[in-house]
Every structure is written in structure tokens, then in C-alpha cells.
């Protein structure tokens, strides 16, 4: 799924909404979280959201260290 794909923004919004509290708890800003979400979607275009969320949370933990 490319960033020019209209579904990309829908998926980004959905994942960002679900990761908002986790990101805040780690002290990550919106731009950092968005970059992680974009990367997860690019790396896992056909994966279900649960798998994407797990990967994003792992990367967010690393980014906050």
C-alpha cells in the first residue's frame, strides 16, 4: 500500500487512533508515531491490524529508549 493509495490514510488514521495512548505513555510525539505507522504499513501491506499494531508497539518501545 503506497502513501498515494487513498486507503493508506484510512489505515494510518485507524492505527494512529489505536496507538495514541501507548505513544503518549512513552512520550513519543505524533510525527514519530506517524513515521513508525507508515513504516509498519509499508513493511506489512497485507497483514491484519493486530499484527501491525504489535510490530508498531515494538518499534515504539525501541524509539522511546
Language model: regions and residue ranges:
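Hydrophobic-face residues of short alpha-helical interaction/recognition segments
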Residues: 19, 23, 56, 60-65
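A short, charge-rich alpha-helical start-of-domain segment used by transcription regulators
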Residues: 1-21, 45, 49-50
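Short, aromatic/basic-enriched loop-to-helix "N-cap" motif that marks the start
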Residues: 35, 47-62
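Conserved RNAP core-binding helix
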Residues: 30-47
Amino acid at each position: 500500500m503506497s502513501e498515494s493509495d487513498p486507503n493508506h490514510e484510512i489505515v494510518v488514521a485507524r492505527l494512529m487512533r489505536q496507538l495514541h495512548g501507548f505513544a503518549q505513555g512513552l512520550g513519543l510525539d505524533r510525527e514519530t508515531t506517524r513515521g513508525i505507522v507508515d513504516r509498519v504499513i509499508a513493511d506489512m501491506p497485507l497483514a491484519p491490524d493486530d499484527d501491525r499494531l504489535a510490530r508498531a508497539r515494538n518499534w515504539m518501545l525501541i524509539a522511546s529508549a
